[in-house]
Regions:
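A short beta-loop-alpha structural element at the N-terminal edge
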Residues: 4-20
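Conserved GNAT-fold acetyl-CoA-binding loop/helix
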Residues: 23-43
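A short helix-loop-beta-strand connector motif used in the catalytic cores of GNAT acetyltransferases and
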Residues: 43-56
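A short, internal acetyl-CoA/4′-phosphopantetheine-binding micro-motif in the GNAT/acyltransferase core
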Residues: 86-99
Length: 171
């Protein structure tokens, strides 16, 4: 029998697995060269629940299948908190697997928003496989509220001009 796929709340012990997944997400879909220190700062805040939370699909001390990073912060023009999605990422090895991992991460985000009683701001900033992501988000969240445009680059392009060593040594 297949094991049920669930999203668990991340803990500080998940930091290495989250960093690995985050760097993979940045390599595939980041707009610019990632700063591992900034990634760690955001991830650590979510793992320690300091104005954030992380949802993870995968067991501790293994390679994670998928994750979502959410941060509670005000919009730039307000003091009221919103729950802002920093990243949703399903590892490529699990995208076509049964279980609807992206859907489960969306449900995790909605539950967090409802429990905190603050609005969720979530979106798609990608140059690849956009239409399928839009359909998923419309099913999960209803009609969209805006859109993004990127001028001058595509997500993931920074990798073409960077070596793996650059990512880890430039910071």
């Amino acid at each position: 029998m297949d094991k049920e796929i669930t999203v668990r709340v991340g803990t500080p012990e998940d930091v290495d697995g989250m960093m690995t997944l985050a760097l993979a997400a940045c390599k595939e879909n980041g707009l610019t060269n990632p700063n591992p220190v900034k990634l760690l700062h955001e991830i650590w805040a979510g793992l320690t629940r300091h104005h954030g939370i992380v949802g993870i699909i995968g067991e501790p001390n293994t390679e994670f299948e998928a994750a979502i990073l959410l941060r509670a912060e005000p919009m730039w023009y307000s003091d009221d908190l919103t729950l802002v999605e920093r990243a949703v990422f399903v590892h490529p090895d699990f995208r076509s697997a049964k279980g609807g991992r992206a859907r489960l991460l969306c449900e995790f985000a909605k539950q967090a928003s409802e429990m905190l009683d603050i609005p969720l701001v979530i979106g798609i900033l990608s140059s690849e496989r956009v239409s399928g992501k839009v359909r998923l988000y419309e099913r999960q969240f209803g009609p969209q509220s805006g859109a993004y445009w990127i001028y001058g680059k595509k997500t993931g392009d920074w990798v073409k001009d960077t070596t793996p060593e650059d990512v880890l040594t430039e910071q």
